[in-house]
Regions:
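Glycine-rich nucleotide/cofactor/substrate-binding loop typically near the N-terminus or early
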Residues: 2-64
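Short coil/turn connectors at secondary-structure junctions
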Residues: 2-4, 27-30, 51-56, 65, ...
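A short linear-motif detector with a strong N-terminal bias
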Residues: 9-14, 35-38, 79-82, 126, ...
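Active-site loops and adjacent core secondary-structure elements that bind or stabilize anionic groups
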Residues: 17, 108-185
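Residue-level detector of functional hotspots within protein domains
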Residues: 19, 42-43, 68, 73, ...
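Electropositive phosphate-/nucleotide-binding environments in soluble metabolic enzymes
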Residues: 23, 27, 36, 40, ...
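A short, charged helix-loop
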Residues: 56-80, 84-123, 185
Length: 185
């Protein structure tokens, strides 16, 4: 596909540690993602610390949701599937969407590839904004799932906060009245 990926250790100059728990939480990664390209001070900091700009972040979060659905999964197994660096990286990229595209689901790959091929390897602000919105929704869903699981395993009958995620099914022609928009979730 014309990509030249490099190992995270080569980017950071620092090896993975703590059984892979610490990989991407590094200024060479987050600095490259969070730097505003329109601020001279940000660009000067990047140059001073030899940080390259990162324009595209693609993260598939650890499969926590699938792990806790498995029969007989232990609490330590589930906890090891709680992604820390992935959501942090996703949120960094989504925050800086005026300059960075963030992809969080394989279903987004085709639209990204189409956009890149149509815009000489670049993405439009509209796509970056759409992807950022989806990224924040994904990390919110991920965190809500973790919170619900932890609440359910702590012996609490009812969680103090209950978050529900609804998936859009389709848009309706109109709402209760013809001038209103509506959708089914």
């Amino acid at each position: 596909a014309g990509l030249n990926p490099i190992a995270i250790e080569d980017l950071t100059g620092f090896p993975e540690m703590m059984d892979g728990r610490v990989k991407t939480l590094h200024p060479a990664v987050h600095g490259g993602v969070l730097a505003r390209r329109d601020l001279e001070t940000h660009m000067a900091s990047m140059a001073e610390h030899n940080i390259a700009p990162i324009d595209l972040v693609c993260v598939n979060l650890y499969p926590f949701e699938q792990t806790i659905r498995r029969e007989g999964v232990s609490e330590p197994e589930a906890i090891e599937q709680i992604d820390i660096g992935g959501p942090a990286l996703v949120r960094s990229a989504a925050k800086n969407h005026p300059f960075v595209a963030v992809v969080t689901m394989p279903s987004q790959y085709d639209s990204l590839v189409t956009e890149l091929s149509q815009h000489d390897g670049c993405t439009s602000f509209a796509l970056r904004r759409e992807l950022a919105s989806a990224a924040f929704a994904r990390t919110a869903e991920y965190d809500a799932t973790i919170a619900a699981w932890m609440s359910g395993t702590s012996g609490t009958t009812f969680p103090s906060v209950l978050r529900l995620n609804y998936v859009g099914q389709h848009q309706l022609r109109y709402g209760e009245n013809p001038h209103q928009a509506a959708a089914v979730y």
